[in-house]
Structure formats: C-alpha cells, structure tokens
Regions:
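Polybasic, low-complexity association/targeting segments
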Residues: 1-14, 124-132
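Immediate flanking context of iron-sulfur cluster ligation sites
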Residues: 1-5, 29, 33-53
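Functionally engaged cysteine thiol sites
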Residues: 7-10, 50, 58
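Iron-sulfur (Fe-S) cluster-binding segments and ferredoxin-like electron-carrier domains
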Residues: 12-34, 57-80
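Short Fe-S-cluster ligation motifs
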Residues: 40-50, 76-108
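Short flanking/linker segments adjacent to small metal-binding domains or redox-active Cys/His motifs
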Residues: 55-56, 61-67, 88-132
Length: 132
C-alpha cells in the first residue's frame, strides 16, 4: 500500500483563510481522499499537521513500507490532486517505489522536494555508519 501524508495546515504565502474557507492543505486532503476512495484501498490518505515545507505549500509525502519516499510541494488543491493520485499509483505499482522519471506527472517531476531511501530492514552498526 502507498500512503499519502497530506499537510492539512498548509496555506499559500498570501493566503488568509477564514473560518468559512478551509486552508488549502485541508482542501487538498479532501480532494485526495475522495479520489483515493475510488481506488479500493490501493492508496491511504493521512492528514498530518506539518511537513516543514511551508515556502512551497501545499505539500504531500508519498511513502510505502520498504519503498523510497517522496516529498512533493507547490501543489494547488483545486488543480493538482489528479497528478498526486497518478504518482501515488505509479509508486504503488513499483516494488521499490521508484517510478520511472518520465512517467511521473510533470508537476511531480518539477516540484519533488526530496526523495528519501527506505529504512534498512535491520540496522547493524556497520550499516549505520556506512562502513564496510
């Protein structure tokens, strides 16, 4: 399973959401949740308080057990949910979580903030230091 962690506190730099209008991050979470629900459990969507990418909000993290993880920013909640879902599906389909770069949606290619390796299945003192 691939998990989308969505920052629900994200807001645009010039944005001052009112009580009547939810923050853009919360709107993105709602859009992604609706889209993922139609996929039958392939993708889980989880709200988080902050992904520390405030200058490039809205932000999501895409991860899966034993797979590479990605942080993607500069997402528009009204436009980019389909691209995030498409990327999450590619991530889900690849055993290592490394979808081919050219197959990723353009917005994801241009706005990937970080790619994080999976945790080793067992850490030894050697593997923690990188020594051989």
């Amino acid at each position: 399973m691939t998990t989308l962690f969505v920052c629900i506190t994200c807001k645009a730099r010039d944005d001052s959401p009112t009580k009547e209008e939810p923050r853009p991050g919360l709107r993105l979470f709602a859009a992604l949740s609706r889209s993922a629900a139609a996929l039958g459990g392939e993708i889980a969507v989880v709200p988080v308080q902050c992904l520390a990418n405030c200058t490039r909000a809205c932000t999501v993290a895409v991860s899966g057990a034993g797979k590479w993880s990605y942080v993607v920013g500069a997402l528009d909640p009204d436009r980019d949910a389909p691209d995030v879902i498409a990327f999450a599906r590619l991530h889900h389909a690849d055993a290592a979580g490394l979808p081919p770069w050219r197959e990723r949606p353009e917005h994801v290619r241009r706005n990937t903030v970080a790619r994080v390796p999976p945790l080793p299945s067992s850490l030894s003192p050697q593997s923690e230091t990188g020594a051989r």
